Amino acid sequence: MNCLFLFMSKKPKSRGNMEKEKKNIRGREFLQKSAPELTTRKTTLSFNLPTPRSLPSPTSIKDLYTDREQNQNQNLRVFSFKELSDATCEFSRKLKIGEGGFGSVYKATINNPTVGDSHSSPLTVAVKKLNRQSLQGHKQWLAEVHFLGVVNHPNVVRLLGYCSEDRERLLVYELMSNRSLEDHLFTLRTLTLSWKQRLEIMLGAAQGLAYLHEIQVIYRDFKSSNVLLNEEFHPKLSDFGLAREGPEGDNTHVTTARVGTDGYAAPEYVITGHLKTHCDVYSFGVVLYEIITGRRTLERMKPLAEQKLLEWVKKYPINSKRFKMIVDSKLCNKYPIAMVRRVAKLADHCVNKIDKERPTMAFVVESLTNIIEESNSEDMGSSVGIRG
């Protein structure tokens, strides 16, 4: 089966355009057979990858869905299973770059044809292959296509296409070659992120979350492993399988099954299942403490009193001299301690047990921006001893 592109053209129908329209029809027929959920108009799902020019500064995710349906400018690429199997050498272990409960992620090289051009160039991508046995995996696959097919932001990973063939469900993303924030904080030993890099990564992640909240989407799974880094260490949020539309009208929350990752989920959500944007803010605060300490939110191999990050850091008050003891030793004292304290105070604000007392992500973006600007005015390489 050939690769298909879904799109509509407003230009006069030349012979080339007629051929493209035939591909469009074949693509819709293919989807109706393999994943009818994606062609049901009632769900207002769309598979266009928006461009800044086409994005009308929407007020909600529903506006994006409506805009894509009316525009009908659908251009997410539909891959055949054979094409992705060939691109990954039949999903070779040598090309596997990630694995989780959903399935596995592989590095692959695909042809990248330009519309209207018979030539193509190779493109390196990431292919996520879901476990065939997982019903939940299929739901999350739909959710990813659902959201990433319409959102467009520099700090949200770009979905290039998908495959839905028989029971196979795959997603194709831009490749984030520097792996995840989690990898650099806890796993990789070849490179330590500087304090400045950590702040800039968290600022980008905050901007991505602020955008999602602006269009009324709750991410629900913010954690260091979902912050991916490209070759320039530019951060992008990934894995939208748990994302949900936010509350409407006078509703203050949406009620969902309690899912997520231990240590990152807000306590009120764990108890009640009530989901708000405040839940994402809590998770963000947890990751702020991860970049400060170089510790995971849960360290089960540590002594019992040190296993839970948020409980452990309370023993080292921010304004005390002992606070320096929790800062990641891999930073080798190369950070302005006053700025680290400010980030810790922001983290405390984010993880406030009273959800309404937490800041908005827009406030977090502003705060981190100010901290970075002030940090840049200081010597980022000075030792903590000098800064006291």
UniProtKB/Swiss-Prot annotation:
A biological process term (GO) from this entry: defense response
Keyword Nucleotide-binding: yes
Gene Ontology MF: a single term: ATP binding
Lipidation (S-palmitoyl cysteine): 3
Keyword Transcription regulation included in the entry's annotation: no
Enzyme class: transferase
Disulfide bonds: none
PROSITE patterns linked to this entry: PROTEIN_KINASE_ATP, PROTEIN_KINASE_DOM, PROTEIN_KINASE_ST
Annotated ranges, domain Protein kinase: 91-372
UniProt function note: May be involved in plant defense signaling.
Family, per entry: Belongs to the protein kinase superfamily. Ser/Thr protein kinase family.
Identification of the protein by name: Probable serine/threonine-protein kinase PBL20
Gene designation per UniProt: PBL20
